Each structure stands twice: as structure tokens, then as C-alpha cells.
Curated annotation (Swiss-Prot):
Annotated protein name in UniProt: Synaptobrevin homolog 1
Membrane-spanning intervals of the chain: 95-111
Subcellular location: Endomembrane system
Gene name in the database record: SNC1
Record note on modification: Palmitoylated by SWF1.
PANTHER family: SYNAPTOBREVIN FAMILY MEMBER
Species of the source: Saccharomyces cerevisiae (strain ATCC 204508 / S288c)
Side Cytoplasmic, residues: 1-94
Lipid-modified sites (S-palmitoyl cysteine): 95
Keyword entries, A-Z: Coiled coil, Isopeptide bond, Lipoprotein, Membrane, Palmitate, Transmembrane, Transmembrane helix, Ubl conjugation
Region (Disordered): 1-30
Keyword Transmembrane among record annotations: yes
Length: 117
């Protein structure tokens, strides 16, 4: 090697061509490096996916909290409506009972007065 070129441990030298084991070793090293690079890429993708999933989980938690608050409001409103309808139904039953009593009085009183003479 000349002194003008920097030392490269992966570059083939004149002596390496004579030894096929060294070439096989370097190709195996290159294969391993490619596998490592692929693994690193996959791990980075997985880390990004975990981060996205964490953001989505936070969003889902916020939506669940909002839903719980809405459910409580709905329950209170439903109870108010139920009580209002019960009171309205009670008033209707009382009016119906009053009408029946008035009709009975209108029918029975003249008959009673007529037979009492």
C-alpha cells in the first residue's frame, strides 16, 4: 500500500486475492452487516409504531373520559325526564279519576233524588 491512500480494513489488498477464505469472510461480514442494518431498520419502525400507538392510546383515553362525562349528563337528563313523565302521568290519572267521579255524581244524584220522592 502506498502512503497516500488511507488504510481501509475492508478493501482487498494484493495478498487477499490469493486467499479465497478472506474473500468469503468479507462477504459473510457484508451479509451480517446487511442483516444488522435490516434489523436496525425494523427496530426503528417498531419504535415509531409504538410511539404512534401511545399517541392513539392517549387519544382513546381522552375520548373515553369525554364519553364518561357525557354518559353522566345523559343519566341525569334521563332521570329528570322520567320524573317529569311520572308526574305528568299522575296528573292525567287524577284528572281521569275526577272526571269519573263527576260523571258518577251527575248520574247518581238525580236518580237518588228522583227515588227519594
Amino acid at each position: 500500500m502506498s502512503s497516500s491512500t488511507p488504510f481501509d480494513p475492508y478493501a482487498l489488498s494484493e495478498h487477499d486475492e490469493e486467499r479465497p477464505q478472506n474473500v468469503q469472510s468479507k462477504s459473510r461480514t457484508a451479509e451480517l452487516q446487511a442483516e444488522i442494518d435490516d434489523t436496525v431498520g425494523i427496530m426503528r419502525d417498531n419504535i415509531n409504531k409504538v410511539a404512534e400507538r401511545g399517541e392513539r392510546l392517549t387519544s382513546i383515553e381522552d375520548k373515553a373520559d369525554n364519553l364518561a362525562v357525557s354518559a353522566q349528563g345523559f343519566k341525569r337528563g334521563a332521570n329528570r325526564v322520567r320524573k317529569a313523565m311520572w308526574y305528568k302521568d299522575l296528573k292525567m290519572k287524577m284528572c281521569l279519576a275526577l272526571v269519573i267521579i263527576i260523571l258518577l255524581v251527575v248520574i247518581i244524584v238525580p236518580i237518588a233524588v228522583h227515588f227519594s220522592r
